């Protein structure tokens, strides 16, 4: 993507979801948001995407939108996953929003002994519904074209052994790691994890759960994609410097 195209994408009024990027049609809710909330005017430009990597520019018309560019297919992102224990208040929602912005591809809610949030039945469904809504909003704001996957909840005992566990005071290499588990307020319960599970530290300070999730996501995405030093016009791309 050229710098000019990138700036055009960023400066578009908004990004909206459509079923078919080639022939973009907004649903009732998105049409209301575009014309009544954002008060889009004829001729203004937006980005449309299907959440599967395809996107295009579109122009606002009289109660509709019209595609004005070729359909672009973005490359699939480097697979990264965060296992996060639901946190009190809106902390989990903040984490979900930032993980979407950072480019994490998958989030799995984690059931831990020390979790302090009701996460069963109707409570669980409401929480996951909010996560999905926030993820969609964040994707539009950051111009992300691939939806993040929000999986069903799993217990600590069911987490694959190749998932690294974030634990203060430990050290471990991120080499080959694509998934990290972040604990609840108060930390993991003694003996909650198998001795076989890799432990990694996230710095010398004790982080809040939502901060730990953001730090872990940054490390994973940095290692996988090297977006810390990225060019649009042929400059050197530095990748994989975190060992």
Model regions and ranges:
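RNA substrate-binding interface of SAM-dependent RNA methyltransferases
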Residues: 3, 73-162
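A C-terminal functional module that forms or caps the active site or interfaces directly
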Residues: 175-190
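N-terminal positively charged helical leader segments and presequences
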Residues: 1-73, 235, 241-242
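Structural motif
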Residues: 83, 165-167, 179-182
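Structured adenosyl-cofactor binding patch, chiefly the S-adenosyl-L-methionine
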Residues: 190-243
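Conserved beta-strand scaffold positions in the cores of enzyme catalytic domains, especially
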Residues: 150, 163-165, 197-201
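Glycine/charged-rich beta-loop-alpha catalytic/anionic-binding loops adjacent to active sites
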Residues: 24-26, 77-81, 194-202
